[in-house]
């Protein structure tokens, strides 16, 4: 473990875990499926650009497809419906009464269709390729004896359900303890927006000092830090050739430490709990 700043873990009661690339190695297979839909999407906008899965993963990890699709349209100068431009003040826009025959513009209805297509493709693929991982299940099972486990993700609930079933994590983090930036909020707001963490904390009835976020991606870490949470980076499923760069980026995003495995987190929390017990005994004496 690398620690960058002091961590006060005495009040932690809930571990708020990002899902993709953190609880299971879903990033690479997800982008295998997502790239096919993404390329059909950019073609529908009249763009010649195409993405391979690895390129897409490196440029969009931590974001959901909805955000990625709008970002791609804006970056390419494709007009978007004003309702989609809330976070893109400089974007080219068209009127909300855009004629159906208009070419190479993105409406909210069209975006929703692409979001659903990508969701179905990725969910089906992940449900087939993911498997239970003892290196995740064993430490999380032990941690669940002392902490409530929750998932806080940018991904859709259907995708999360398929992943949690395939990896055997259903029993540790059931559906009611999964929070989706795509489906749980009144309006979808992907990380790095802190909305999904703030929503999860409110639903769980905890203060920011009671939740510890564990994130593998920079947008995810930025989301948790912006929500006021102590955050630990996790590079367990980050490709080895990318780990040094990711560790540095996570540090800049504000994480307090970086771990290489869930076992490391278990040892860290056990150590802090033991230290707290010793201090409590000293205080009583």
Predicted regions and their residues:
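N-terminal helical cap/lid subdomain that shapes the substrate entry/recognition surface
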Residues: 5-19, 23-137, 141, 145
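Asp-based, Mg2+/Mn2+-dependent phosphohydrolase catalytic module
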Residues: 1-14, 137-141, 157-285
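Conserved SAM-binding loop
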Residues: 23, 149, 213-214
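Short, flexible active-site loop motifs that bind/organize anionic cofactors or intermediates
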Residues: 55-59, 101, 126, 150, ...
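Glycine-centered short loops/turns at secondary-structure junctions
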Residues: 146-147, 228
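Conserved phosphate-coupling serine/threonine residues in phosphotransfer and NTP-handling enzymes
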Residues: 153-155
């Amino acid at each position: 473990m690398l620690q960058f700043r002091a961590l006060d873990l005495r009040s932690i009661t809930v571990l708020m875990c990002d899902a993709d690339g953190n609880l299971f190695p879903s990033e690479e297979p997800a982008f295998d499926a997502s790239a096919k839909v993404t390329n059909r999407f950019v073609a529908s906008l009249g763009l010649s650009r195409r993405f391979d899965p690895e390129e897409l993963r490196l440029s969009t990890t931590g974001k959901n497809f909805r955000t990625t699709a709008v970002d791609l349209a804006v970056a390419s100068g494709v007009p978007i419906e004003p309702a989609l431009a809330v976070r893109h003040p400089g974007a080219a826009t068209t009127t909300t009464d855009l004629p159906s025959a208009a070419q190479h513009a993105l409406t909210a209805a069209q975006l929703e269709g692409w979001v659903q297509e990508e969701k179905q493709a990725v969910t089906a693929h992940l449900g087939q390729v993911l498997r239970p991982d003892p290196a995740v299940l064993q430490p999380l099972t032990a941690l669940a004896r002392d902490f409530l486990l929750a998932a806080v993700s940018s991904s859709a609930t259907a995708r999360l359900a398929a992943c949690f079933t395939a990896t055997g994590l259903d029993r540790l983090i059931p559906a009611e303890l999964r929070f989706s930036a795509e489906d749980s909020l009144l309006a979808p707001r992907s990380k790095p927006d802190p909305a999904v963490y703030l929503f999860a904390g409110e639903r769980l009835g905890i203060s920011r000092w009671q939740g510890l976020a564990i994130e593998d991606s920079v947008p995810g870490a930025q989301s948790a830090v912006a929500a006021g949470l102590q955050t630990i980076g996790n590079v367990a499923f980050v490709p080895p050739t990318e780990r040094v760069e990711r560790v540095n980026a996570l540090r800049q995003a504000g994480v307090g430490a970086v771990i290489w495995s869930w076992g490391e987190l278990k040892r860290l929390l056990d150590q802090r709990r033991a230290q707290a017990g010793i201090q409590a005994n000293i205080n009583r004496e």
